[in-house]
Amino acid sequence: MKLNDIIQGLDIINVKGELNIDINNVQYDSRKVTKGTLFICIKGFVSDGHKYIKDAIEKGASAFIVEEDVAIKGCTFIKVKDTRKDMAKVADNFYNHPSQKFNVIGVTGTNGKTSITTILNEILTLNKNKVGLIGTIKIFDGEKDIVSNSTTPESIDLQYHFNNMLDNGCDYCAMEVSSHSLALNRVDETDFKLGIFTNLTPDHLDFHKDLEDYRKAKEKLFFKTTMANIINIDDEGGKKIYENIKGINVPCYTYGVDTKADFMARDIKSDSDGVSYRLITPSYEEVIFIPVPGMFTVYNTLAVIAACYVLGIPKPIYKEGLRLSNGVSGRFETVPNDKGISVIVDYAHTPDALENVLKTTQQFAEGKIISVFGCGGDRDTEKRPLMGAIGQKYSDLCIITSDNPRTEEPEAIIKDILEGIDKKKENYHVVVDREQAIAEAISMAKKDDVVIITGKGHETYQIIGKVKHHFDDKEVANECLSKM
């Protein structure tokens, strides 16, 4: 593709060099540069792409999009105000606007994104659709699974995956949309048919200045949709978003339990086998069952059903899809054993998510609840004491341990968590080493007790310093169970 075509729509300050040249690759990572690459220099949080211009030239880069003046001859330099923002436009142009050619469903919110996109994928597949998936656990391009390094990829990678999905015959993509991706322009040129909002609770406040800034980032998604928006109206953040978008020329549907909504759940029954409820929609009522317990399952499935309604998925298809769903890896996932105890692994890493999984556990636990949790390092510190208070309140015993400490000292993170603990009570314990914490929890469990290990879920690593070490909560739990 000609460089001149790729840069259409950019607000260019100046150009040095030739625009009528062939470009066969677009990159922001100098390690992926090949001959004929257009290299976009991004000023990131850790490094600055402008520092890698000479390296990119040595690897064959032909042209650059920059924010700074560059005194190098022999290549084309296009100066713009914001390279990160323009990267989304360049990527969309280079791959010929792939998201306009199939149905992209975007799901945003603090919790529930992975569950909703996964269940939607299952139902649409049952409906004989071919579906791509983009999210926290993995990317699926219609043919193969790809390791996911973030909830929502950078715009170049995102458009690349969209293009592959089209090539592989996908007619849908169910996609998690993070607040970071909305704030950092990753999805600026994505054509969303449908937007879904789950909930808003404190998270990522190391990146967003406050909860309102976080909410506003999420809200951006719903001004990008062309078919419909679906909002959790029970959530305070959802109420604000609904008020702000209800006047736009895109239908908005609501779902909830406590507030009158287009899609509501009544007569909710939850036990260890799953959850059932009476579904009330704009045109019919129906009894729904899904073999995953908890109120979070009720909300997630209401969002899914609303999406199916908008997309015209037949009722028997989505009912069967919900009935057959096995949930999501690392989301309230049971570790099978014959020891008479329940061991559950869950990704809950926010106060709201931890409270939800522990309350759900209380609904069916016949014995004691032993929880294992920590908080990630180099991330929002405000949630740490909240997590401590919640873990202690809803557990018979909570074991506070390490999560992904990153560059912080684990003991310092745990000290923050302990700020929320009532020291007068004796139902808490600190075990810094996560493997030892899991082992201790399982060894203490008696018949009918529940051990719930939270924070990492599907993750198969632990980040200590800047290094990822292999660590899998399920593997560790299985090893501990085998020694009982």
UniProtKB/Swiss-Prot annotation:
Molecular functions per Gene Ontology: ATP binding; magnesium ion binding; UDP-N-acetylmuramoylalanyl-D-glutamate-2,6-diaminopimelate ligase activity
Protein location: Cytoplasm
Catalytic activity: UDP-N-acetyl-alpha-D-muramoyl-L-alanyl-D-glutamate + meso-2,6-diaminopimelate + ATP = UDP-N-acetyl-alpha-D-muramoyl-L-alanyl-gamma-D-glutamyl-meso-2,6-diaminopimelate + ADP + phosphate + H(+)
InterPro entries with a match to the protein in the record: Mur-like_cat_sf (IPR036565), Mur_ligase_C (IPR004101), Mur_ligase_C_dom_sf (IPR036615), Mur_ligase_cen (IPR013221), Mur_ligase_N (IPR000713), MurE/MurF_N (IPR035911), UDP-N-AcMur-Glu-dNH2Pim_ligase (IPR005761)
The EC number(s) this enzyme carries: 6.3.2.13
BP terms from Gene Ontology: cell division; cell wall organization; peptidoglycan biosynthetic process; regulation of cell shape
Protein name, per record: UDP-N-acetylmuramoyl-L-alanyl-D-glutamate--2,6-diaminopimelate ligase
Positions contributing to ATP binding: G109, T110, N111, G112, K113, T114, S115
Enzyme class: ligase
Family named by the database record: Belongs to the MurCDEF family. MurE subfamily.
Cofactor: Mg(2+)
Gene Ontology CC annotation, any one: cytoplasm
Location of N6-carboxylysine modifications: K218
Organism encoding this protein: Clostridioides difficile (strain 630) (Peptoclostridium difficile)
Claim: ATP-binding is one of the keywords in the record: yes
Matching Pfam families: Mur_ligase, Mur_ligase_C, Mur_ligase_M
Top-level lineage group: Bacteria
Described purpose of this protein according to its UniProt entry: Catalyzes the addition of meso-diaminopimelic acid to the nucleotide precursor UDP-N-acetylmuramoyl-L-alanyl-D-glutamate (UMAG) in the biosynthesis of bacterial cell-wall peptidoglycan.
Motif (Meso-diaminopimelate recognition motif): 403-406
Keywords: ATP-binding, Cell cycle, Cell division, Cell shape, Cell wall biogenesis/degradation, Cytoplasm, Ligase, Magnesium, Nucleotide-binding, Peptidoglycan synthesis
